[in-house]
Design a protein with these regions (language model features):
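Conserved, mostly hydrophobic/aromatic
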Residues: 10, 44, 87, 114, ...
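Conserved small/polar residues in nucleotide/adenosyl-binding loops
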Residues: 191-194
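Glycine/small-residue-rich loop that forms an oxyanion/phosphate-binding "nest" at active or ligand-binding sites
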Residues: 30-42, 50-62
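Hydrophobic faces of well-ordered beta-strands that scaffold small-molecule active sites
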Residues: 2, 21-25, 52-54, 85-89, ...
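Catalytic cores of alpha/beta
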Residues: 34-40, 98-103, 150-163
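Active-site-adjacent beta->alpha loops and helix N-cap segments on the catalytic face
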Residues: 4-18, 32-34, 59-76, 94-99, ...
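Glycine-rich phosphate-binding active-site loops on the catalytic face of alpha/beta enzymes
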Residues: 50-60, 113-121, 160-181
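Active-site mouth loops of central-metabolism enzymes
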Residues: 22-36, 88-98, 146-151
Length: 194
């Protein structure tokens, strides 16, 4: 992921690979207008982004302006033109009811992923990840957890067991290297192919 400024350069460097080109929309607090976010989304796609992270307007959610948020989310999906969409809801600032409402709005708008955090603030609790996973179960919206705090390997694997589909982290080698230990203590199950 990069800021949109770097998207064309990253897209050019990654041309011919299967690595996704990520661009950030509405960072860090999602307080831009819907029109600005839609334009930013269209620009990122035009410049070569293949996956987008958008920040939800937490203030609007806390004000219960659900129709406005849902409309903004739909405009984001439309502006993405089929590119993978994620919505960061920043769970550290939300109540359980607000987390549920945010997930439901993402599902209704057709957003591909609901993401717990930017990773810049407090990460999610286990209970928050379970709540997100329960809300999204049986839908086309998947759960990504970012902002995994220490102990990262244990927390990352527990979040996956709790229903997260993806972990966003800068500590992937540390987490992967701990797989055998996590399996040994029962956090990770042995993988068997279907």
């Amino acid at each position: 992921f990069s800021s949109s400024y770097w998207t064309p350069i990253v897209a050019e460097e990654l041309k011919g690979t299967d690595i996704l080109v990520g661009a950030a929309i509405g960072f860090p607090f999602g307080q831009q207008t819907s029109a600005v976010k839609a334009f930013e989304t269209e620009e990122a796609v035009r410049m070569g982004a293949t996956v987008l992270d958008n920040c939800m307007n937490v203030g609007a959610l806390k004000d219960k302006r659900y129709d406005e948020i849902k409309q903004e989310f739909k405009e984001y999906v439309e502006a993405a033109q089929g590119v993978m969409t994620k919505m960061i809801i920043e769970v550290c600032y939300l109540t359980d009811d607000e987390i549920k409402a945010a997930c439901e709005l993402c599902i209704e708008a057709g957003i591909d992923w609901v993401k717990s955090s930017t990773g810049q603030y407090a990460g999610p609790t286990l209970e928050q990840v379970i709540l997100m996973a329960d809300c999204c179960k049986g839908t086309n919206t998947r759960v990504k957890v970012s902002g995994v705090k220490d102990p990262r390997p244990q927390n990352a694997y527990v979040f996956l067991r709790a229903g997260a589909d993806l972990i966003g982290t800068r500590q992937a080698p540390q987490i992967i290297d701990s797989f055998d230990t996590m399996r040994k203590i029962g956090i990770c199950l042995l993988y068997t192919s279907p």
